[in-house]
Amino acid sequence: MAGYLSESDFVMVEEGFSTRDLLKELTLGASQATTDEVAAFFVADLGAIVRKHFCFLKCLPRVRPFYAVKCNSSPGVLKVLAQLGLGFSCANKAEMELVQHIGIPASKIICANPCKQIAQIKYAAKHGIQLLSFDNEMELAKVVKSHPSAKMVLCIATDDSHSLSCLSLKFGVSLKSCRHLLENAKKHHVEVVGVSFHIGSGCPDPQAYAQSIADARLVFEMGTELGHKMHVLDLGGGFPGTEGAKVRFEEIASVINSALDLYFPEGCGVDIFAELGRYYVTSAFTVAVSIIAKKEVLLDQPGREEENGSTSKTIVYHLDEGVYGIFNSVLFDNICPTPILQKKPSTEQPLYSSSLWGPAVDGCDCVAEGLWLPQLHVGDWLVFDNMGAYTVGMGSPFWGTQACHITYAMSRVAWEALRRQLMAAEQEDDVEGVCKPLSCGWEITDTLCVGPVFTPASIM
């Protein structure tokens, strides 16, 4: 079918055959390869992304999803999301070029970085990208000079003190400073059309969204009073991408819907969208990593046995990827990755205190420690799930690693859902609700039943 994604872009997974099965085949093939060089690789379930999209539309029907390109800019991800009709949130010139290269129109792109280089602003102006964010006077001055026709979105600060990744110290203007910026924009004939915020990643309190929406309402009133035509509300990101998150996406959506009904009721003429990254891709990616070396370290008390029956030693495993690459979440998000063994150990196998280390020659490249694992060997593969966010393209040439290869997969059911999506966009007809599992992943067993597929229109 015509569109951004074609069948040649992925492996079609038939019913009864999961991406876990595909991953096993790929690790077996890698182990049997004649070359002695092995490399970690991803398997990406594009069907899981399709399923997440329909879940989003069901839970937040008034909100247009925009994808945060910085989270995972791999071609398969961009193409499937483009096929689904998403807009794209770009942080720099390279990301704007990337999405325009696959055919995304400028009207579906927002340059959401409040602090941009002049070259990035000029690129947006030259290529018709109108929607830009800002949070300071210097940014306004750059826009006046390089892109005077831009439609600006004022980024406000939020209370993200409980988030794992806080952004308000770096980005966002306080409420008391908003009027001054809005007046400055009016003085220089810069059009401000809306408000954005970002509560940070891993926020455990959904009410942070409600408070930020209430704050945005105040800024809308300031802008309207000063003569700005305010009609864009950007809810930012921070939405969880895994089922095991402290706060479920559905809980956050419920709070957002209530706040929108109160402060931006339906029919108010405001275009609402969100910038989602982790939500779409985290659970869709699984990575296989090879053990490249190991050593056994005896504990201090020879002959001592642990309570679980293991002998008194700890085993150090060296992997071909570490915290300076795809496991950077260990450093930045304080996450301890848990490996999945390709072969399930028997209950009779002893377990040993174990740790996993990356290839860097320093003491900080520890992927995980305090693990209890059976005896593993050089050449064995470890599998890690929920690896889709901020991992792709994270190779480190300094340590001799390259960006990991990605094998994309999708179930036939999900592919047919995409076909219907495209036909709906082309013919402007409603499509049937999708009432079958859309993911070919091994974790997803429930079904999804949603109404007509929503295709975002131009943001301008």
From Swiss-Prot:
Q: Which PROSITE patterns match?
A: ODR_DC_2_1, ODR_DC_2_2
- GO terms under cellular component: axon; cis-Golgi network; cytoplasm; cytoplasmic vesicle; cytosol; dendrite; endoplasmic reticulum-Golgi intermediate compartment membrane; granular vesicle
Please give the biological process terms from Gene Ontology that the record holds.
Answer: agmatine biosynthetic process; negative regulation of protein catabolic process; ornithine metabolic process; positive regulation of catalytic activity; positive regulation of polyamine transmembrane transport; putrescine biosynthetic process from arginine, via ornithine; spermatogenesis; trans-Golgi network membrane organization
Signal peptide start and end residues: none
Chief location bin: nucleus
Which tissues express it? Expressed in the neocortex, thalamus, hippocampus, cerebellum, medulla oblongata, gray and white matter. Expressed in neurons, oligodendrocytes, basket, Purkinje and pyramidal cells. Expressed in spermatocytes and Leydig cells of the testis. Expressed in luteal theca cells lining corpus luteum cysts and in hilus cells of the ovary. Expressed in primary and neoplastic mast cells (MC) (at protein level). Highly expressed in brain. Also expressed in testis.
InterPro entries annotated for this entry? Answer: Ala_racemase/Decarboxylase_C (IPR009006), De-COase2_C (IPR022643), De-COase2_CS (IPR022657), De-COase2_N (IPR022644), De-COase2_pyr-phos_BS (IPR022653), Orn/DAP/Arg_de-COase (IPR000183), Orn_de-COase (IPR002433), PLP-binding_barrel (IPR029066)
Q: Where are the annotated segments for Necessary for polyamine uptake stimulation?
A: 117-140
Q: Where in the cell is it found?
A: Nucleus; Cytoplasm; Cytoplasm, Perinuclear region; Membrane
Site annotation Not modified: residues: 70
Its keywords, alphabetically, are:
Cell projection, Cytoplasm, Cytoplasmic vesicle, Golgi apparatus, Membrane, Nucleus, Polyamine biosynthesis, Pyridoxal phosphate, Transport, Ubl conjugation
Record keywords: Transport included? yes
Q: Which residues form a coiled coil?
A: none
As for PTM, the annotation reads:
Ubiquitinated, leading to its proteasomal degradation; a process that is reduced in presence of antizymes. May also be degraded through the lysosomal degradative pathway in a proteasomal-independent manner.
For this chain, one GO molecular function annotation is: arginine decarboxylase activity
Pfam families, A to Z: Orn_Arg_deC_N (PF02784), Orn_DAP_Arg_deC (PF00278)
The cross-references to PANTHER family, in alphabetical order and at most eight, read: ANTIZYME INHIBITOR 2 (PTHR11482:SF4), ARGININE/DIAMINOPIMELATE/ORNITHINE DECARBOXYLASE (PTHR11482)
Function, in words: Antizyme inhibitor (AZI) protein that positively regulates ornithine decarboxylase (ODC) activity and polyamine uptake. AZI is an enzymatically inactive ODC homolog that counteracts the negative effect of ODC antizymes (AZs) OAZ1, OAZ2 and OAZ3 on ODC activity by competing with ODC for antizyme-binding. Inhibits antizyme-dependent ODC degradation and releases ODC monomers from their inactive complex with antizymes, leading to formation of the catalytically active ODC homodimer and restoring polyamine production.
Subunit structure of this chain's protein: Monomer. Interacts with OAZ1, OAZ2 and OAZ3; this interaction disrupts the interaction between the antizyme and ODC1. Does not form a heterodimer with ODC1.
- Name the family the entry cites: Belongs to the Orn/Lys/Arg decarboxylase class-II family. ODC antizyme inhibitor subfamily.
Q: What is known of its domains?
A: The N-terminus domain is necessary for its localization to the ER-Golgi intermediate compartment (ERGIC).
In Swiss-Prot or TrEMBL terms, this protein is called Antizyme inhibitor 2
Organism field: Homo sapiens (Human)
Quick one: which gene encodes this? AZIN2
